[in-house]
């Protein structure tokens, strides 16, 4: 399933801008992650650091009041500098189902690709996270690139006994 142009138009009507996060956005991003009820919630401190240190590879969508209503965080892999790793994507509940996550992901990867060579995108998704699976599968389809999946971290590697495996989604290569 891919996001239709109508979904992107509707998503754009839901926010005023997509831009890099600022440190002041850290608390709102933490709340959106917490309220998603699917993401592994990091400490509020880590979201502040993310906004400071990884703003160039992250993005927020802002609502009418300028506050974040969705975010995507990422980083460039140190050992593969042409690979963007998407760490987390979340949309505030009131704005879900309108193509906003897809618009954010497209905007972020376009911005990163404008600054450096981008050959692939990676993320990990647990098998029960169907929304993220749809998001990244449709992203690969929209950009007409391959999507490979393999278990990166088995569930037993995590200290919590209930953690599902993290499946690596490798998307690309993109035309350079």
From Swiss-Prot:
EC top class named in words: transferase
Source domain of life: Bacteria
GO biological process: ectoine biosynthetic process
Domain N-acetyltransferase: 16-171
Keywords from the UniProt entry: Acyltransferase, Transferase
UniProt-listed Enzyme Commission number(s): 2.3.1.178
Entry coiled-coil feature ranges: none
Single GO molecular function: diaminobutyrate acetyltransferase activity
InterPro entries: Acyl_CoA_acyltransferase, Ectoine_EctA, GNAT_dom
Pfam family, one: Acetyltransf_1
Pathway annotation: Amine and polyamine biosynthesis; ectoine biosynthesis; L-ectoine from L-aspartate 4-semialdehyde: step 2/3
Family recorded in the similarity comment: Belongs to the acetyltransferase family. EctA subfamily.
NCBIfam families per record: ectoine_EctA
Name by which UniProt lists this protein: L-2,4-diaminobutyric acid acetyltransferase
């Amino acid at each position: 399933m891919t996001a239709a142009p109508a979904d992107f138009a509707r998503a754009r009507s839901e926010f005023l801008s997509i831009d890099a996060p600022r440190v002041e956005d850290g608390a709102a991003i933490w709340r959106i992650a917490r309220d998603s009820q699917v993401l592994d919630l990091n400490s509020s401190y880590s979201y502040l650091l993310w906004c400071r240190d990884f703003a160039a590879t992250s993005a927020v969508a802002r609502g009418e009041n300028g506050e974040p209503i969705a975010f995507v965080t990422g980083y460039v892999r140190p050992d593969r500098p042409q690979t963007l790793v998407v760490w987390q994507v979340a949309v505030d509940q009131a704005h879900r189902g309108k193509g906003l996550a897809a618009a954010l992901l497209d905007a972020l990867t376009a911005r990163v690709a404008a600054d450096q060579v981008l050959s692939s995108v990676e993320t990990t998704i647990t098998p029960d996270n169907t929304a993220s699976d749809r998001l990244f599968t449709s992203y690969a389809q929209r950009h007409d690139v391959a999507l490979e999946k393999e278990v990166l971290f088995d569930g037993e590697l995590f200290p919590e006994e209930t953690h599902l495996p993290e499946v690596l989604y490798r998307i690309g290569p993109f035309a350079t």
